[in-house]
From Swiss-Prot:
PROSITE patterns: VOC (PS51819). Residues 25-145 form the VOC domain. This is Glyoxalase domain-containing protein 5. Belongs to the glyoxalase I family. The gene is Glod5. CDD domains: GLOD5. It comes from Mus musculus. It comes from the Eukaryota.
């Protein structure tokens, strides 16, 4: 099997010309969690994500054109991350709802805001963000793009 950390990899060569990007968007992220039921309840009630079932009884959280596939720790599906652990995700999610509406929803469910609202830089420009944690202690940043 190819070892991507091997010193002999061609991608390490400084003589290679940078390639054009071959990726256009993110489809899904696999999130390893302690308890799938707690996770689906949190994300559906707090953020309004749609819980879907696929390939038998696997669960996903759908939003926009993306989704989080859920793996319960110790019951992951192959292939999987080298070291899948709950609480290791740090992700920024974009909302089109007023950020105040997200803040009110968090307050209504007693979810503490760790930081924010604060200005940050998103993939497409300035964003206003709040930070909070899910039941596995993953760091969630919910942001809206700043319009002039």
């Amino acid at each position: 099997m190819c070892d991507p950390t091997s010193e002999s990899q061609l991608w390490r060569s400084s003589s290679q010309i940078p390639s054009p990007c071959l990726i256009c968007r993110l489809d899904h992220i696999v999130m390893t969690v302690k308890n799938i039921e707690d996770t689906t309840m949190f994300y559906s009630k707090i953020l309004g994500m749609e819980v879907t079932t696929f390939k038998g009884n696997r669960k996903a959280l759908c939003f926009g054109d993306q989704k989080f596939n859920l793996h319960e720790v110790g019951k992951e599906f192959d292939p999987k991350a080298a070291h899948p652990v709950p609480g290791s995700l740090d992700v920024c999610l974009i909302t089109e709802a007023p950020l105040e509406e997200v803040i009110e929803r968090l307050k209504a469910f007693d979810v503490p805001i760790e930081e924010g609202p604060v200005f940050r830089t998103g993939a497409k420009g300035p964003i206003l963000s709040i930070y909070f944690r899910d039941p596995d202690r993953n760091l969630l940043e919910v942001s809206s793009y700043v319009t002039s």
